[in-house]
Amino acid sequence: MGGLHQGHQQLIRRAAEPRSGAEPACIVSVFVNPLQFGRGEDFDRYPRDLDRDRDLAAEAGAQALFAPSLEAMFPQGEAEITRIRPPTSLADRLCGHSRPGHFEGVATIVCRLLTLVKPQRLVMGEKDWQQLVILRRVVADLGLAVTLEGCATVRGLDSLACSSRNRYLSEAEAATATALPQALAQAALDSRSDPGAEGLAAAVRARLEASGLRPDYVELVRAHNLTPLQRVEGLTLLAAAAYCGPSRLIDHVFLMSRAPIVAIDGPAGAGKSTATRALAHRLGLLYLDTGAMYRALTWWVREQGVDPADAAAIAPLLQDLDLRLLGGVDGEQQVLINGHDVSTAIRSPEVTALVSIVAAHGCVR
């Protein structure tokens, strides 16, 4: 909607990245959408500085700025435009509870912009995660010919999420506003010992109020569909909105009920195992040597005297195979096949020469 900042510039840089050797044309839309503002909200004072927006967009790699007039967006007037209503299960909770009609206004104008511009890709920020989830659903349900990509939230040095509305904040209010990301970050730590929604939300509210912020909501939901949760389950979103003076701030943090999975890939001999083992040790994760698994299966195929290129002959060998990797977080893993330690045998030159052939078979993968 204009009022461009560092977060918008990151979106533009992402959109302008070369794809398949070609440099895409990056178009930035600027339109302060009246449909997504409720009565008494800040439509009239929302930041508008098209010259500054143009300069920031060009600096980040945009080739064009699309800033349509109200007449261009609403040829028959605002009241006559066809509205897009997202599912209430997505639009009426979190921010939608206190801003009725907001996401209908967002979806309507985004669809209108997509119709006018016809882009191949649409890049949007994750700061308003609910908006991103809703628009993904709208794009999917309407079969729109565009790929919607999310881009991680950009934050200032004070951890406050970049927002056009941050310029409403006085110096003192800006300092107070940092309590929101700080409270969510602390909740992420607390969730490891107490993953319950009630306790996490109450703790965040207490920290916000103690800092002088007025909470609007603090809720724990499933990240992909915004379904309310009673405790952290899988990929979970802890979302919050709070008022700092007259300004409404939103933020969120992702929580998980298990440790994350980190995969490192690269060419043979590049040091993947060394780097992955070190990373697992630093982060307290379990190191899983998938390369050793492929080597073990290759060793087994050789032991059975089967042609490494014959997938049909290999498949039966895997039916009752017992393959185990044993070891600690940072130690070398012991590889067992049917109870036999093959940790050393799988590193032989003979096995190494055949791994890529065996690993290419679907039954092995």
Model-derived features: positions:
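Post-Walker A helix-loop "phosphate-sensing" segment adjacent to the P-loop in P-loop NTPases
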Residues: 280-290, 303-307
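ATP-dependent small-molecule kinase phosphotransfer cores
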Residues: 293-365
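Hydrophobic anchor at the beta1->P-loop junction of P-loop NTPases
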Residues: 264
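Extreme N-terminal, non-catalytic leader segments
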Residues: 232-235, 244-261
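Nucleotidyltransferase catalytic core that binds NTPs
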Residues: 1-225, 253, 339
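Conserved lysine of the Walker
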Residues: 272
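Hydrophobic positions on the alpha1 helix immediately C-terminal to the Walker A/P-loop
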Residues: 11, 275, 279
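Walker A (P-loop) phosphate-binding loop of P-loop NTPases
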Residues: 269
